[in-house]
Every structure is written in C-alpha cells, then in structure tokens.
C-alpha cells in the first residue's frame, strides 16, 4: 500500500454514507480497505492514508447520518466531493428514501462546502404508467427551484434495464400494477431538452450520464446545451483542490461513460435502500441481510471479521513472497552486473 495516489469512489456499489459510516471511519483509522473484485473475486487492499488519496468521491441518497463524519474527514486533511441522488420518483420506486431530508441535507452540504462540491443526480428517469412527461416536468421544476443557488450541475440518465432490473420491474407490474414504458430516443431527447431549459432557468447545467445521443440531441435550436457527464471527474477535483494542475486518466466503467479512473471500495448486494431500479442488488432480502449482519470491524465491507482477517493474511503472505522474489531478481541482476564490470 502507499505506492500510488488514487481517487477513491465511496461508492457506486452501495450507499456507504447512509448505512456504513462507522465501517468507513474504521477503515480510515486503520489506513486501508479490502476489496473483493465483483468479477472474478480477486481480493486486494487499497491504502486510505491521506497521502495516498487524491480525493474521495462520495455517493449517497442520504448524507444525513454522515455529516459529523465529514467534519472529521475534512479535519484529517482529505479532499472530497459529492454525488447526491435526489430523483423525485414516487415511493413505489424508492420505498426507503426520505426525499425532504435529502433536499435539506443537500442544502446543508452546499452551505458547508460549496455548490461546486455537489453533483445533483436526477437519476434515473423511468418512464412508466405513473411517471410520464408531465410528471417529470413538474417534479424536476420543484427540485430545480429548491436547489437554485445550491448546485451548479445536474447529472441524469434514463434507466438501464439490466437483467436484474427487468426482473424487479416485472415484479412491480405484477404486485403494484405499475408498467414501465419503453420510449423511443426522440421522446427522450425532447424531454431531456425540456429539463435542460428548466435547469438553465435556475442556473443549473445539465449533464447526460452514458447517453451521448442526448448531448447531440441538445443541439436543437432554442434549447440549452446538455454536456457529457463525468460522475467521477478529474477536472472537478482539479478545479476544487489542485489549482497547480492534476494528472488523471479517463477510465470508463461502461459504454459512453466519461469517468476518470478510480478505485471503488463498496460491495454489491449490501444496500438496504431497496430501490426497484437498482443494478447493484440481486434482491432486497439479500441486501437487508447483508446490512443487518455487517461487521464494522471487517476490512472488507459486507464480510465477516473472520473472513476479512483470513484474506488479509493471505494477501500479506502473497505480498511477502512477491517482495522476496523481486529482491532475489534484483540481487541476481546486481551480481551479474558486478561480474560484467570486472576486467
């Protein structure tokens, strides 16, 4: 650990500020976090020491429980900004989200830090039998008017129907009678442009996440331009914290993603928000169970302390073997070079 400074994502995979603040603060105390790669299961550790972290990018639907932690994190010298999701969706899609609390907390963050520290995520947009064009115009207008002066950027996208999301939508139709409507690109472009016009009225710039056709579609005469989103954005970090300049690399996580390279320390299937559209959970029950059973002292979020300690020992053992191998290689090269220098 400590060889390379990283941008740390906290987290796309779960809501750490809302539910796992104690775990995260314990990770800062110990100076590292364990990660299980979601594809392949490789286990590794990443340094969270201040000198090894470029910036934390915090993601949440509820920063309320994390506010005091943020003060401590700030005092420790870390840099950070926020991706704050406030969608305006009906509770049938977000049963455990307190929207008014989210609105007030976003304003508090803006006052404490600055509007430039916050990406407001109006994401995802789901066109359904209860959420049509008129619904979104009204819901977005209400939120944009609330956030005028508190944010400068709004990131949005239309819902991506991954297989697990499709299953949830099918259950929603069977149990609640809510039908998801598959709209064409022309409809989506027109709605996005209307939202961009509302945003501009309140001094907010719209950014399209993984939807370049919406950026192109905003070039219609009479509408404000929609820009390409970079949810983890090296240029935002540079403008906030590094006036002397910052080197960073783009590393998309999926098609048309504009994100800067980062390391995510979250774990899938651990978020108890229970949002129907979530791609990070297989099902609500599994996520609730993971949250109920989580160990704040484990290095790996969502896993037991016993598992964590075993994996840390294995990683350390592997690292020790690797260091010995490198040392032997260097020694061999050095001996060879000395021999060559002899007359």
Residue ranges: model-predicted function:
Residues 1-93, 99-115, 283-321, 333:
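Conserved Radical SAM active-site core
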Residues 88-96, 124-134, 175-184:
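Surface-exposed cleft-lining segments at the edges of enzyme active sites
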């Amino acid at each position: 650990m400590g060889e390379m400074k990283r941008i740390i994502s906290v987290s796309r995979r779960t809501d750490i500020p809302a539910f796992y603040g104690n775990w995260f603060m314990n990770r800062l105390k110990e100076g590292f976090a364990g990660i299980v790669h979601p594809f392949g299961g490789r286990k590794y550790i990443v340094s969270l020491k201040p000198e090894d972290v470029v910036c934390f990018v915090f993601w949440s639907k509820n920063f309320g429980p994390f506010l005091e932690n943020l003060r401590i994190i700030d005092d420790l010298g870390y840099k950070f900004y926020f991706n704050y999701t406030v969608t305006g969706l009906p509770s049938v899609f977000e049963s455990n989200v307190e929207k008014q609390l989210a609105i007030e907390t976003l304003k508090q963050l803006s006052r404490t830090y600055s509007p430039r520290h916050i990406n407001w995520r109006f994401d995802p947009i789901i066109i359904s039998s209860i959420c049509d064009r008129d619904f979104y115009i009204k819901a977005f207008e209400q939120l944009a008017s609330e956030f005028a002066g508190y944010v400068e950027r709004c990131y949005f996208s239309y819902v991506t129907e991954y297989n697990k999301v499709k299953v949830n939508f099918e259950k929603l139709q069977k149990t609640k009678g809510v039908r998801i409507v598959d709209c064409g690109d022309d409809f989506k472009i027109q709605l996005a442009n209307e939202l961009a016009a509302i945003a501009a009225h309140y001094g907010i710039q719209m950014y399209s996440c993984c939807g370049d056709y919406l950026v192109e579609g905003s070039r219609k005469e009479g509408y404000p331009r929609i820009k390409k989103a970079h949810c983890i954005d090296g240029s935002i970090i540079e403008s906030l914290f590094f006036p002397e300049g910052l080197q960073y690399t783009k590393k998309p996580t999926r098609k048309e993603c504009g994100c800067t390279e980062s390391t995510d320390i979250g774990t899938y299937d651990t978020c108890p928000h229970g949002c129907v559209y979530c791609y990070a959970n297989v099902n609500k029950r599994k996520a609730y169970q993971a949250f109920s059973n989580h160990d704040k002292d484990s290095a790996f979020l969502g896993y037991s302390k016993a598992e964590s300690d075993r994996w840390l020992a294995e990683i350390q053992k592997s690292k020790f073997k690797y260091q010995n191998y490198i040392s032997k290689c260097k020694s061999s090269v050095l001996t060879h070079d000395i021999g060559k220098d002899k007359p």
